[in-house]
Curated annotation (Swiss-Prot):
This is Proline--tRNA ligase. SUPFAM superfamilies: C-terminal domain of ProRS, Class II aaRS ABD-related, Class II aaRS and biotin synthetases. CDD domains: ProRS_anticodon_zinc, ProRS_core_arch_euk. The lineage of its organism: Bacteria, Bacillati, Bacillota, Clostridia, Lachnospirales. The gene is proS. One of its GO terms (cellular component) is cytoplasm.
Length: 479
């Protein structure tokens, strides 16, 4: 039995050290490994398969709203990056530069894209001439480079995978509608696919994207009580259009500037899944995103007929549309159970000679470890139902955790005490002054996460300065 436990013994307890627990899970579940390039990581098959499932489902949802995929170069000339001053100032500290082409110095250095607003603007300048060319609703799946000082697998790395949508519209109203539409798409995706509840809201001016008129965000609460920004949608107004000269002729033959949006999510969604649902045995994956949904584990598989029945069950489950693995390795059952739990496979099916003789199998849920004995003939019908239940239960548990770790502060002493002694979101009123936002961060390390669309009037005054309040804000320590 000691050998069976090696997989889980290697994981640090969440309560002992959450950061180390997270790293242990990433490595032991074989999601990633570290690269020889500092600050970069290697996606192993198990980790990349999760990203593929995220990408495929999100891309399907994008296309239902009229999004088309494109791909633009990864290099941006310095002169192009500097066209929009607020934008370049926001990214300058993180930019990686290419100064040589082979052995020859470049006449103009190129940055490796930290984001692609400037490239899309340069592209749209030539693509858009008339109102008939609008709207443009493009997205690209790619990697970007930001020279981060502190990195952590999936959450923050110097190169990461993401999608970035860039759109151009004839009117401000159309741009705002698209901005909100994509934020809602992200929120629905997180809740329906990743089983992660999110708060939708608007960023403060201090926290909004460089060059945007407004930034909207979805904020999730991790198991350790820290917030994770899980997707953003930006309304650029006509600021970038004026900087780059993106104009169109309207129906009255008048020249007008387009209105633009940008929206994106990244592989930090994988980190969000790990930190929302995982436990001390490893990953707990929502069925809709799990690369393998069912692990069929034959017990005493060398006995006549056991392995054949396991293969037969595996084929029946695949025919029912499930992602299935039959673990026919020569490891003992205890080791296989530990590995299945470590990898977060939502359901395992245990079957040995006595089970087969009785025409039954045991289904074990990864999230609750509940055991359900089912007729082998009913597995293909029952398991999809159980997976649906797991998906719903995981969302409800995550929502209950968030509600239990969301606090209200009506004065500054209460705010500071909550920030010092409790982990989670703090709801508090704010006057709209950046000085108060800065003071709260300096005193408590809490940042404004968002001004939620669902506003509550907790009091009439700012929690920090006592002046009249303008909005209720979610505050928290964040990744």
């Amino acid at each position: 039995m000691a050998e069976d436990k090696k997989l889980v013994e290697a994981i640090t307890s969440m309560k002992e050290d959450f950061a180390q627990w997270y790293t242990d899970v990433c490595k032991k579940a074989e999601l990633m490994s570290y690269s020889s390039v500092k600050g970069c990581m290697i996606f192993k098959p198990a980790g990349y398969a999760i990203w593929e499932n995220i990408k495929n489902e999100m891309d399907r949802r994008f296309k239902e709203t009229g999004v088309e995929n494109v791909y633009l170069p990864m290099f941006i000339p310095e002169s192009l990056l500097e066209v929009e001053k607020d934008h370049v100032e926001g990214f300058a500290p993180e930019v990686a530069w290419v100064t040589y082409g082979g052995l020859n110095p470049l006449q103009e250095r190129m940055c490796v894209r930290p984001t692609s607003e400037t490239l899309f603007c340069d592209f749209y300048k030539d693509e858009i001439q008339s109102y008939r060319d609008l709207p443009k609703v493009y997205n690209q799946w790619c990697s970007v480079v930001r020279w981060e000082k502190e990195t952590r697998p999936f959450l923050r790395s110097r190169e990461f995978l993401w999608q970035e949508g860039h759109t151009a519209h004839a009117t401000a109203e159309e741009a705002e509608a698209r901005t909100q539409q994509m934020l809602n798409l992200y929120a629905d995706f997180c809740e329906e696919v990743l089983a992660i509840p999110v708060i939708k809201g608007r960023k403060t001016d201090k926290e909004k994207f460089a060059g945007a008129e407004a930034t909207y965000t979805i904020e999730a609460l991790m198991h350790d009580g820290k917030a994770l920004q899980s997707g953003t949608s930006h309304n650029f107004g006509d600021g970038f259009a004026k900087a780059f000269g993106i104009q169109y002729t309207d129906k009255d033959n008048k020249l007008k500037y387009v209105h633009q949006t940008s929206w994106g999510t990244t592989t930090r969604l994988i980190g969000a899944v790990i930190m929302t649902h995982g436990d001390d045995s490893g990953l707990v994956l929502p069925p809709k995103v799990a690369p393998v949904q069912v692990d069929v584990i034959p017990i005493m598989q060398k006995k006549a007929g056991v392995l054949d029945k396991a293969y037969e069950v595996g084929q029946a489950l695949k025919a029912a549309g499930l992602r299935v693995k039959v673990d026919d390795s020569d490891k003992n059952p205890g080791w296989k159970f530990s590995e299945q739990e470590m990898r977060g496979i939502p359901v395992r099916v245990e079957m040995g000679p006595r089970d087969i003789e009785a025409n039954q199998a045991v289904i074990v849920r990864r999230d609750t470890r509940e055991k359900i004995t089912v007729s082998i003939d009913e597995l293909a019908d029952r398991i999809p139902e159980i997976l649906d239940t797991i998906q719903k239960d995981m969302l409800e548990r995550a929502r209950a955790h968030r509600e239990a770790h969301t606090y209200t502060a009506l004065n500054y002493d209460e705010f500071k005490d909550t920030a010092a002694n409790k982990a989670g979101f703090i709801k508090a009123m704010w006057c709209g002054d950046q000085a108060c936002e800065d003071k709260i961060k300096e005193d408590t390390t809490c940042t404004s996460r968002c001004m939620p669309f669902a506003q509550e009037k907790l009091s009439d005054v700012c929690v920090c300065c006592g002046k009249p309040a303008k909005a209720m804000v979610y505050w928290g320590k964040a990744y």
